[in-house]
Every structure is written in C-alpha cells, then in structure tokens.
C-alpha cells in the first residue's frame, strides 16, 4: 500500500463546482481526506478550470498545510507563451497563483512534434533547467504521452 500511496495523485483538472466557481469547501474536504489517507501528490496546470485550479489549490492546500506535507506538479503548456521572454513571467505567475516558492515537478506539457518545435525555438527546455538550477523547480519532467519521434536526433 505504501508504494501505491507514493504513486497516486490528486489532479486539480476537475473539481466540484458551484455554478462557474470551484466549490472551495468541498475541495478543501477532499484535500484533507486525501492527505489524511497518506497521499501527498497534487497536480495542476495554468489552464485547468480557466486558471481557477491553481487558485483553488492555493486556498485548499498550500495556504493550509506546511510545504513538506505535499508534492506539487505544475505544467508549462505551449499556448501560454509565444517567445522565450514570456516563459519566466508565466512561471512566476504560476508560483504566485499556487502560493509556493517552488514546484516539485514542472512538466513540459502536451509534447508533440509540432509543440516540440515551438518549445525548442523559445528555448523552453533551457529556461526550465535554469529554473531548476535556481531552486524554483526540483524536477523537470516530460509526460509519458510524448511522441517518440520528436526526440530523435534527425
């Protein structure tokens, strides 16, 4: 069961809603139950619930629990930046929205051959690893849905 607890996550992509707003009380109850059961991994992205996911995560998790109680993943998605200079301000806004000083995992989200070209032209990977060097990201990661062909050297 311990191995399962290490590998089971709480995704903030879909949360209980009241009208068009996150039901904060219910989400907090869910977060509390998740942590009480021994789970620690939380996942969000800037675009989830039109940005409300990160804010709900801050309200229900990061403002209520010490940083060592959870592992947090966020993602960098291609349609939120057009050039290299857009990445850091986006990243800093993600940290602020989530209420943390660093992310445990920062995923290069939805990698395909086309998106890989965009990430590469914007020096996204270099920026992500620089953020890691600065201690703002513990691990840079790539989703397992990544197309193999976009990583070939040809």
What is each stretch, according to the model?
Residues 5-9, 40-41, 69-75, 102-107, ...:
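Structural preference for beta-strand elements that scaffold enzyme active sites
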Residues 18, 32, 82-154:
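Glycine/proline-rich, positively charged
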Residues 19, 46-48, 76, 143-146:
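Structured beta->alpha junctions
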């Amino acid at each position: 069961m311990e191995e399962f607890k290490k590998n089971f996550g709480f995704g903030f992509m879909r949360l209980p809603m009241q009208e068009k707003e996150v039901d904060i009380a219910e989400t907090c109850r869910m977060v509390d139950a998740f942590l009480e059961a021994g789970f620690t991994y939380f996942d969000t992205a800037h675009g989830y619930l039109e940005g409300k996911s990160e804010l709900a995560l801050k309200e229900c998790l990061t403002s209520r629990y010490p940083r060592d109680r959870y592992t947090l993943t966020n993602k960098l998605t291609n349609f939120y930046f057009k050039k290299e200079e857009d990445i850091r301000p986006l990243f800093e806004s993600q940290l602020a929205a989530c209420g943390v000083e660093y992310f445990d995992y920062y995923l290069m989200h939805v990698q395909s051959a086309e998106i890989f070209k965009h990430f590469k032209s914007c020096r996204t990977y270099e920026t992500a690893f620089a953020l890691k060097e600065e201690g703002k990201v513990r691990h840079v990661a790539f989703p397992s849905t990544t197309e193999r062909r976009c990583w070939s050297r040809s």
